[in-house]
């Protein structure tokens, strides 16, 4: 599960950097924060693996919610990275509007999905774990962008 999530974050990050013309200090710091969350991800993943199906439902919920919040923050930071690059005009001038819109729309749904799955996890932790994996698999699917 963690591997798929890290892979999805890496693919999203790679898609963003493909469109960058340059970077500034703020973008680099946002990037470092994203790297910090990726490095932190094994901790909540371990909590899920240790406490789901092993302990009380309350402990399961805490572990799954903590994992989901980590994923939500990671997805929000990835989206913020992209929106910051757009807002500060760090994106290549030859990037087409269709490409920019597609990537923006591709990065945004994960946020809403994570919020819904976190809420589901409060009642059905195992279903939430499956949901987190499904979101990661969705983001592992190729982005279809037509280059001009």
Where do the language-model regions lie?
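Multi-pass alpha-helical transmembrane bundle typical of ion/small-solute transporters
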Residues: 1-148
């Amino acid at each position: 599960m963690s591997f798929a999530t890290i892979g999805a974050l890496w693919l999203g990050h790679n898609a963003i950097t493909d469109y960058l013309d340059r970077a500034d200090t703020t973008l680099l710091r946002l990037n470092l924060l994203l790297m910090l969350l990726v490095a932190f991800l094994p901790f909540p993943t371990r909590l899920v693996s240790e406490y789901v199906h092993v302990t009380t439902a309350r402990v399961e919920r805490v572990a799954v919610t903590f994992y989901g919040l980590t994923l939500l923050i990671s997805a929000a930071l990835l989206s913020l990275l992209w929106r910051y690059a757009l807002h500060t005009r760090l994106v290549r001038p030859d990037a087409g509007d269709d490409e920019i819109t597609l990537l923006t729309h591709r990065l945004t749904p994960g946020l809403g999905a994570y919020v819904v799955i976190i809420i589901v996890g409060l009642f059905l932790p195992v279903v939430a774990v499956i949901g987190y994996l499904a979101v990661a698999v969705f983001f592992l699917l190729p982005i279809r962008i037509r280059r001009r």
